[in-house]
Amino acid sequence: MAFLALFALAASAAASVCQRTLHDGWRFRQGSSEIWHPARVPGNTHLDLMRERIIDDPFFRLNERAVQWVDKEDWMYETRFTPTVSELSATNQVIVFKGLDTYADVYLNHQRICEADNMHREWRCNVKGILKEGENLLEVYFKSPIRRNIPKFDALPYRHNTGPDHSQIGGIFDKTISPFARTAGFEYGWDWGPRLVTFGIWRPV
C-alpha cells in the first residue's frame, strides 16, 4: 500500500508539470542595427545570416575571410509568447536554455534573468514574479567574445601556447584568445574547418 501511495503521488506530480518549447517567432539583428531578420531556434547567427543572404557560404572558396566581421559584433535575439493558464498558476516557473553560445544576457519583460558565459552547460532561469499574463518578451543579447576576451589576452604577463586558433584569419593578429572562452574550440579554426566564432541559441529552449 505504501508503494502504491508513493507511486500515485509521483504520478500526480508528474502530471502537474507542464512544459513546452519556445522555438517559434524568433528574430535577430546586429547589435548596432535596428533591422530585424527572422531567426531559427535552435540555430546560430552564421546560419541565420546565410538564410537572409547577408553572408555567403563560408565553406566555399575564401568566403571564410569575408565573414570575420560577424564575431566582432553583438547580436540580439527576441521572441514573444503568451503563457497558458496552467503555466501562470504553476508553483515554479522556469525558462531553460539547453545551450547558449556563449556570452549572453537574457531578459524577460526587460528584467535580466540570466548571464551566460559557457556554451557547454544549460541555464535555468527562474521567472517567478516576472512571467505575466498576456504577451511576454524574451530577449537574448549575445556579446562579442572577441571584444570580451582580447583584454584578458593583453593582460597576461606572458604569451601562452595554444592549439589551433586561426587568429590571423580572424584579423586579430597573434591574439589567440580561444582558451579564455568556454566555447567549442573548433569555432576558432582547425585544419579541417574554417574559423567561425559564432553566436546563438544552439540547443532547445
Language model: regions and residue ranges:
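Surface-exposed, low-complexity/disordered Ser/Thr/Gly/Pro/Asn-rich loops and linkers
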Residues: 57-69
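Short Gly/aromatic-enriched secondary-structure transition segments
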Residues: 35-43
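Accessory beta-strand-rich segments of carbohydrate-active enzymes
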Residues: 18-32, 46-47, 52-53, 72-204
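Cleavable N-terminal signal peptides of Sec/SRP-targeted secreted and luminal proteins
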Residues: 2-15
